């Protein structure tokens, strides 16, 4: 039975939505003070930095946050919602690409898939980077505990991933208050540091950032790449738009998250001006010794919440890609009876866990992992800007000069960050790029293979109208019950129906042809979900439409429509086709490799009976070969 999800967003307490947003939206960017400024100082020269270098780094971080997060995401991109949902794939569907010229359509689609793959790849690195940076606080408390850092990080990550299948609905209500405590602590520590060296506030002047780049031309890319770590969580603001909406996210950012982050960065900068040796870990050195242990626990909790948000975001992104036909079906379990956003994708969770732990064991320290971190998000931000600019040009009615001015500003910043992160490739940046490349290859292989299967079905089966009108089936054996056939190509006869008629000479008293369509929007209302067409006395065609964020449960949606026409849905059987993919015997071209990858994915994909929620006891699968 389908779960009934409530989307009531009324809140009994003032600012409850904003506090909730702190726990869901700002986990990634909220934990960046653990490592961002430290990596910037190391990029400049470690303990050999000058006071002006610190002010320059603070200037770059400050204006990166203002321009890349506040202006780009909060003021602009968050306005581009698809029925309330955000994220790269939501932006792709919002563009309605079938209206684009063929060449532009593929460019925009490629940008969207690239960005989605980059964000999924980032899901491997972000939990590792965040938790490892938090646990490294042990080294500040006691250098003798250094050898426990990797072990404890792995244990925390194991706990995070193994708990995913249980769902987080019961404890999610604590995420917001914990993150409120975290941001409050960031701000308080920042003020404490600034009071020790108020001159650090000169770093608000953008000229210090420019001078830093001019004084270190050979390190400009490395420095900018390190400063980018302060804004890597910006994409999450858009991805989580559907949870809270733009006004709530904007208020939480402008009045809580951003002030706390800036205060903490400047507090760390002040400590560095007072004690250059604090470069070993300026975040923990900012804290008075008596609060080190509580801060360690709070930082670990914050990074666990940040990791949870990233994992949930990857699950959501994967579900969108599955429903839009870019990833093979995987079993998706809903872990909440009230919120359709709470899902668990088992196979993906295990893959993420193994990859994440492997990253920790391979890099062992956040300083080394920072060399790989950020490049995937930088490219994802570029693709978001490209798609957003296309949407503004197409649908917002802005004059061309305004669009060009905005495009120039956004892309200048994004390409600067992307170019700076390219310097990380040889030090580990190849890892997220390789993960993203593998994901893109899987997406393309699945999509191409799926199109090939549909093309063969269209080629070798007759139009449904023609099949229904045939007179040569009057002597077939009639089964006195209703059969429901699922069709992938709506206007064509389902292969299962065609094979039963041609090979078994069987026809049913009533045949219901059901096509499931995924709309280019996150949700389809109940009244728009079902369309029934009576073809003749023995055939009924039903088109079911779902949004790409909705649970697909065919019996629960189809049942009332059949009952209204005198058909007992509980007495009907479901007949579905199951393709046995046969790839080429020899691999001589790239398309042959794609065919073999698709065949592997198809063998391991979730079966239709599970994906569509069909009753196993009343479902018949008819297999047939499809040679690619």
Swiss-Prot record:
Catalytic activity: K(+)(in) + H(+)(in) = K(+)(out) + H(+)(out)
Major localization listed first in the record, in broad terms: membrane
Keywords carried by this UniProt record: Cell inner membrane, Cell membrane, Ion transport, Membrane, Potassium, Potassium transport, Symport, Transmembrane, Transmembrane helix, Transport
Regions that span the bilayer: 15-35, 49-69, 106-126, 141-161, 174-194, 210-230, 254-274, 295-315, 343-363, 369-389, 398-418, 425-445
GO function terms (MF aspect): potassium ion transmembrane transporter activity; symporter activity
Subcellular location: Cell inner membrane
GO cellular component, one term: plasma membrane
Disulfide bond sites: none
Protein function: Transport of potassium into the cell. Likely operates as a K(+):H(+) symporter.
Protein family according to the UniProt entry: Belongs to the HAK/KUP transporter (TC 2.A.72) family.
Name of the protein in its database record: Probable potassium transport system protein Kup
Protein source organism: Xanthobacter autotrophicus (strain ATCC BAA-1158 / Py2)
